[in-house]
């Protein structure tokens, strides 16, 4: 956990996360999609290890993440046991187009329970842009996550969908577990950055943030701020985040979305992806 004291630091908290799962589930794709991340490993040896850092904004606080991806091959289980020491959060990653990778999550949970017991974890279904090849139903994965007390996300690095949001949610879980609510005083004076973020996300649905004429890093911060503060709740379904959940909102949530759109100038229909070569079925 990072400290708050030193003014030379460019972050308020430092967290170490592990991405675990079978090989070829796209963990490297998730890391590569973090455009503001640094890829240099602080250690001389990196065989079988991918490392990247990125900084997210969580309720106005800068959280630096050290992200470690150990190869999913069996011979790297020893490496996982070594790197699990000091880990504060774990992302269990599977490929929604590969049933075998989902069935293998049980084995990874056993490894985690043995070598990193009590560490917060979330379940991540990767490659949502290949939903037309889906072998793992969303509802089955969500039920599995709830059974194992995990938050569930379906993500697409290619479409920049839910990647930052998944890291933000895991960061919030970790920091809350370490008593973050005692550090963050509810009557603190909001910074200009906080006020600007609140002003923008209060009148912009989260799925339209990508259409704003802003740099990618700022748009990522806005989406993280929105998710961290429970704003734009029409994009949420329980504690799960996926394309399927976006279609389920109704009642007062649907009305709030209509009110948000009514005060904005006419816009073209929202697109699911920010990249032209991506299509989610």
Curated annotation (Swiss-Prot):
Binding positions for Mg(2+) per the UniProt entry: 46, 69
Biased composition (Polar residues): 270-281
Primary location recorded for the protein, binned into one broad class: membrane
Recorded topology in the membrane: Lipid-anchor
One of the record's GO cellular component terms: endosome
UniProt keyword annotations, A-Z: Cell membrane, Cytoplasm, Golgi apparatus, GTP-binding, Hydrolase, Lipoprotein, Magnesium, Membrane, Metal-binding, Nucleotide-binding, Palmitate, Prenylation, Ubl conjugation pathway
Enzyme Commission number: 3.6.5.2
Residues covalently joined to lipid (S-geranylgeranyl cysteine): 278
SMART domains xrefs: RAB, RAN, RAS, RHO, SOCS, SOCS_box
Annotated segments matching region Switch-I: 41-49
Locations listed in the record: Cell membrane; Cytoplasm, Cytosol; Golgi apparatus membrane
Domain-related comment: The SOCS box contains two defined motifs including the BC box that recruits and binds Elongin BC complex, and the Cul box which interacts with the Cullin family of proteins to form a ECS (Elongin-Cullin-SOCS-box protein) E3 ubiquitin ligase complex. Switch I, switch II and the interswitch regions are characteristic of Rab GTPases and mediate the interactions with Rab downstream effectors. The switch regions undergo conformational changes upon nucleotide binding which drive interaction with specific sets of effector proteins, with most effectors only binding to GTP-bound Rab.
Function in brief: RAB40C small GTPase acts as substrate-recognition component of the ECS(RAB40C) E3 ubiquitin ligase complex which mediates the ubiquitination and subsequent proteasomal degradation of target proteins. The Rab40 subfamily belongs to the Rab family that are key regulators of intracellular membrane trafficking, from the formation of transport vesicles to their fusion with membranes.
PANTHER family referenced in this protein's UniProt entry, alphabetically: LD44762P (PTHR47980)
Subunit structure: Component of the cullin-5-RING E3 ubiquitin-protein ligase complex (ECS(RAB40C) complex) composed of CUL5, Elongin BC (ELOB and ELOC), RNF7/RBX2 and RAB40C. Interacts with protein phosphatase 6 (PP6) complex components ANKRD28, ANKRD52, PPP6C, PP6R1 and PP6R2; the interaction leads to ANKRD28 ubiquitination and decreased PP6 activity. Interacts with DAB2IP; DAB2IP acts as a GAP for RAB40C.
NCBIfam families for this protein: small_GTP
Protein name per the record: Ras-related protein Rab-40C
């Amino acid at each position: 956990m990072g400290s708050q004291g030193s003014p030379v630091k460019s972050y308020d908290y430092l967290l170490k996360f592990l991405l675990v799962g079978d090989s070829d589930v796209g963990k490297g794709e998730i890391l590569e999609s973090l455009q503001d991340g640094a890829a240099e490993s602080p250690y001389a040896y990196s065989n079988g290890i991918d490392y990247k850092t990125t900084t997210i904004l969580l309720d106005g606080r800068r959280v630096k993440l050290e992200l470690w991806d150990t190869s999913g091959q069996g011979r790297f289980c020893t490496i996982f046991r070594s790197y699990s020491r000091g880990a504060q959060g774990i992302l269990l990653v599977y490929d929604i187009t590969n049933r075998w990778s989902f069935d293998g999550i049980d084995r990874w949970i056993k490894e985690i329970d043995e070598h990193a017991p009590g560490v917060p974890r979330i379940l991540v279904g990767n490659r949502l842009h290949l939903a037309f090849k889906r072998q793992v139903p969303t509802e089955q994965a969500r039920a599995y996550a709830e059974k194992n007390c995990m938050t569930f996300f379906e993500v697409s690095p290619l479409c920049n969908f839910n990647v930052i949001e998944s890291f933000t949610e895991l960061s919030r879980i970790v920091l809350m577990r370490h008593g973050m609510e005692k550090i963050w005083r509810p009557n603190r004076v909001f910074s200009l950055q906080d006020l600007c973020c609140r002003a923008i996300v209060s009148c912009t649905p989260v799925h339209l943030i990508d259409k704003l004429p802003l740099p990618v890093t700022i748009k990522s911060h806005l989406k993280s701020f929105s998710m961290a503060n429970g704003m734009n709740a029409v994009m949420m379904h329980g504690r799960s985040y996926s394309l399927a959940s976006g279609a389920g909102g109704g009642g007062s949530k649907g009305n709030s979305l209509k009110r948000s759109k009514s005060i904005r100038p006419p816009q073209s229909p929202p697109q699911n992806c920010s990249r032209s070569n991506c299509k989610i079925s």
